[in-house]
């Protein structure tokens, strides 16, 4: 492999782009993975996800072991040292290989003169590891979350906040959705067993299966044929609450990448579905999902605040609004969220959600159902949002999910369960 494609330096560059430039890892990582051999792609992903999951610990260690921060053109070295710490702490990479490859990464980023510095810091960490980790265990950084988010979780969940944080810091389970138009869930579980894998059904979501051990999609029976889709169990709750029926006109708003659009069509293959998203690039994923599953829907680019631009005066029997949110319920899947979000974002998102709710509600037919969903765990985006919507919307009534005082159903992330998710089912009187 070429020297400039040193895995550790690529991981350092990816993390730097996320933390310093505010880019999402899902945008940064794929082009970098094209630069490495197939056998190394999984390790590159592990290093990027792992460093972002434990970023506050790695930052704390650097501050302890270095007298001044790396700045300017040397900044990538700061993240390269983090990659070194992460390997020594959390991976099975032999320490001598972790050190050698990380030090060599300095050459790839054209900072060969800093090889000695990197080597010295990593070796100092090895010598002081036990003392440093004992001290870290009592520091504020031990939660591996930004302080503002810890405070919000403490306020919202006085008895559960630590469990939420622990769940966010874990590796997520792999959940699948069995396409009921091809197989029953039990039938597909039998095929999975025949393929030498084991899965477990979810008690509440009838299409959801958790793999005992995550696996590449090409190993899953019938993935290419559309028999199964990768989708978290909690995300599958949207179609369960929406309960789409054949022949209905259904709006899936904020639809990309299309997991919920295709789930609606699996439940109601004869439904007339309009899938809308503001992000034209992400809409290509909706088309890809529809194509793999052999389904048809109308797909449009549009802003949820201006429905006249993409649906004229149409009204719908059912609307799924998977609202733009902080994504604080899916941190274990997307650890970069912790460092991309800011405290001020929450009020701005809540305002945007309220605007979309108010403008899309008139597009629901009388007697129709709207499911408001987010992958957030923050009440400002969830229960508080729906409570104030019900107060200002006299023809809206809550159904199945919670009470007027505590509207909606809040799933919290945890262990082998689904991600953090919120649903409120509303009926138009």
UniProtKB/Swiss-Prot annotation:
Any one GO CC term of the record: cytosol
Active site residues per record: 375
Extent of Polar residues compositional bias: 400-412
Keyword field: Cytoplasm, Methyltransferase, RNA-binding, rRNA processing, S-adenosyl-L-methionine, Transferase
SUPFAM superfamilies the record matches: NusB-like (SSF48013), S-adenosyl-L-methionine-dependent methyltransferases (SSF53335)
Chemical reaction(s) catalysed: cytidine(967) in 16S rRNA + S-adenosyl-L-methionine = 5-methylcytidine(967) in 16S rRNA + S-adenosyl-L-homocysteine + H(+)
UniProt-listed Enzyme Commission number(s): 2.1.1.176
GO biological process, one term: regulation of DNA-templated transcription
Keyword Amino-acid biosynthesis: no
Enzyme class: transferase
GO MF terms, alphabetically ordered: RNA binding; rRNA (cytosine-C5-)-methyltransferase activity
InterPro entries: MeTrfase_RsmB-F_NOP2_cat, MeTrfase_RsmB-F_NOP2_dom, NusB-like_sf, NusB_RsmB_TIM44, RCMT, rRNA_ssu_MeTfrase_B, rRNA_ssu_MeTfrase_B_ent, RsmB-like_ferredoxin
Taxonomic superkingdom: Bacteria
Keyword Ribonucleoprotein: no
PROSITE patterns listed in its UniProt record: NOL1_NOP2_SUN, SAM_MT_RSMB_NOP
Primary location class: cytoplasm
Cellular localization per UniProt: Cytoplasm
Sequence positions that bind S-adenosyl-L-methionine: 254-260, 277, 303, 322
Region (Disordered): 397-419
Role according to the record: Specifically methylates the cytosine at position 967 (m5C967) of 16S rRNA.
Protein family (similarity comment): Belongs to the class I-like SAM-binding methyltransferase superfamily. RsmB/NOP family.
Alphabetical list of PANTHER family matching this protein: NOL1_NOP2_SUN FAMILY PROTEIN _ ANTITERMINATION NUSB DOMAIN-CONTAINING PROTEIN, NOP2 YEAST -RELATED NOL1/NOP2/FMU SUN DOMAIN-CONTAINING
UniProt-recorded name of the protein: Ribosomal RNA small subunit methyltransferase B
Organism: Salmonella paratyphi A (strain AKU_12601)
């Amino acid at each position: 492999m070429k020297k400039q494609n040193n895995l550790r330096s690529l991981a350092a560059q990816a993390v730097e782009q996320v933390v310093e430039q505010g880019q999402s890892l899902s945008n940064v990582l794929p082009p970098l993975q094209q630069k490495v051999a197939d056998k190394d792609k999984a390790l590159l992903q592990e290093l990027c996800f792992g460093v972002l999951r434990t970023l506050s610990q790695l930052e704390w260690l650097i501050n302890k072991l270095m007298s001044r921060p790396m700045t300017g053109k040397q900044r990538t070295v700061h993240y390269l040292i983090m990659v070194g710490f992460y390997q020594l702490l959390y991976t099975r990479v032999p320490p001598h290989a972790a050190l050698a490859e990380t030090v060599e990464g300095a050459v790839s980023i054209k900072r060969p003169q800093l090889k000695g510095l990197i080597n010295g810091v990593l070796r100092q960490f090895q010598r002081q590891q036990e003392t440093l980790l004992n001290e870290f265990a009592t520091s504020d950084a031990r939660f591996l979350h930004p302080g503002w988010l810890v405070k919000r979780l403490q306020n919202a969940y006085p008895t559960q906040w630590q469990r939420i944080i622990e769940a966010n810091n874990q590796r997520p389970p792999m959940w699948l959705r069995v396409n009921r138009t091809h197989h029953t869930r039990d039938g597909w579980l039998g095929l999975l067993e025949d393929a030498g894998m084991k899965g477990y059904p979810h008690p509440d979501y009838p299409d959801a299966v958790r793999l005992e051990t995550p696996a590449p999609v090409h190993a899953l029976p019938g993935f290419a044929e559309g028999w199964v889709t990768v989708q978290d169990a909690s995300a599958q709750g949207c179609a369960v609450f929406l309960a789409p029926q054949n022949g209905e006109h259904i709006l899936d708003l904020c639809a990309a990448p299309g997991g919920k659009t295709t789930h609606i069509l699996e439940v109601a293959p004869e439904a007339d579905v309009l899938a809308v998203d503001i992000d034209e690039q992400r809409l290509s994923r909706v088309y890809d999902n529809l194509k793999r599953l052999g389904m048809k829907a109308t797909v449009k680019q549009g802003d949820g605040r201006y429905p006249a631009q993409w649906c004229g005066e149409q009204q719908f029997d059912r609307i799924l609004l998977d609202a733009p949110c902080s994504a604080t319920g899916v941190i274990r899947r997307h650890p970069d969220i912790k460092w991309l979000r800011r405290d001020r974002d929450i009020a701005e998102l809540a305002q945007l959600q309220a605007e979309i709710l108010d403008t899309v509600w008139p597009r629901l037919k009388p007697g129709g159902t709207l499911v408001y969903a987010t992958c957030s765990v923050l009440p400002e985006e969830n229960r508080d949002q729906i409570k104030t919507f019900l107060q200002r919307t006299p023809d809206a009534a809550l159904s199945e999910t919670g009470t007027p005082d505590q509207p909606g159903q809040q799933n919290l992330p945890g262990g082998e369960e689904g991600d953090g998710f919120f649903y409120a089912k509303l009926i138009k009187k």
